[in-house]
A protein has these predicted regions:
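Active-site-proximal segment of RNA-dependent polymerases
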Residues: 77-129
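Conserved polymerase palm-domain catalytic core
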Residues: 113-220, 224-234
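Non-catalytic, polymerase-adjacent accessory regions of viral genome-replication enzymes
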Residues: 1-45, 50-55
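Active-site substrate-recognition loop segments, prototypically the cytochrome P450 B′-helix/B-C loop
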Residues: 48, 52-93
Length: 234
């Protein structure tokens, strides 16, 4: 895939100003600036015009209904995987209450603090990935001490316009003017970015739970609260 990314440059030129804007990100990811600009949607013609950046399809939920998966094309998936391994994997995680999308942890680790508790409360976050918008993703990258311009470029590479038609069961990418970009469920970068974007929520719920004598943990969009006191205030 890397060879394809370099090869399809094919002599097409990118303006000097725009190329300079992507030079730093190109150095970090070791991918041509021209390719990064194209995958950000800044130049959409030729190869990219006929090949969508994401393939979207519905996936049935266990509890009924569907969730829409937005799977990136091979070139974009390659870039996103590079972002994941070079920028997201080394980043610290607020690990006291989060076990999803983390190496060596599973749903079992999420459930352990609540086993045998007298009171257990479960709830789901609605639209976990789509609710993490472009500006929230920018903020995540800025929180990693990445400057504004690079954060914007990285947010462009890891978000897309999402639109789902609940009646027809179809989903598609929106036009830029029709909504705000958000995390696509299906991109390799989305799980960690969603976890990082939820950090403030986790810390607030963790603090509130401790004050009330509860344990709190989150596994992706599943929130669980528990207390050993059968008379605990809910």
């Amino acid at each position: 895939v890397r060879g394809m990314l370099i090869a399809i440059q094919g002599g097409r030129s990118l303006s000097l100003r725009r190329r300079k804007n992507f030079d730093e990100l190109s150095r970090i990811l070791e991918i041509e600036p021209f390719i990064l600009a194209r995958l950000c949607g800044l130049k959409r013609h030729g190869f990219w015009e006929t090949k969508p950046l994401y393939k979207t399809f519905p996936l049935p939920k266990k509890g009924g209904g569907v969730r829409f998966i937005h799977a990136p094309c091979r070139a974009l998936a390659f870039v996103q995987q590079r972002i994941k391994t070079r920028l997201l994997d080394p980043a610290p995680v607020h690990d006291e209450c989060v076990s999803a999308f983390r190496a060596g942890l599973s749903i079992v680790d999420h459930a352990k603090p609540h086993c045998g508790k007298a009171v257990v409360i479960k709830m789901d976050l609605k639209d976990f990935f789509p609710s993490v918008t472009f500006h929230k993703v920018e903020a995540v990258f800025r929180g990693l001490k990445i400057d504004g311009a690079l954060s914007t470029q990285l947010a462009l590479l890891t978000t897309t316009w999402l639109k789902a038609d609940a009646e027809s069961g179809e989903a598609e990418e929106e036009l830029p003017s029709e909504g705000e970009r958000a995390l696509p469920q299906g991109a390799p970068t989305s799980p960690q970015l969603a976890n990082m974007a939820a950090r403030r929520l986790d810390l607030r719920l963790l603090g509130l739970s401790k004050n009330l004598g509860f344990k709190y943990s989150r596994y992706a969009d599943d929130l669980t609260f528990s207390s050993g006191d059968p008379k605990a205030k809910v």
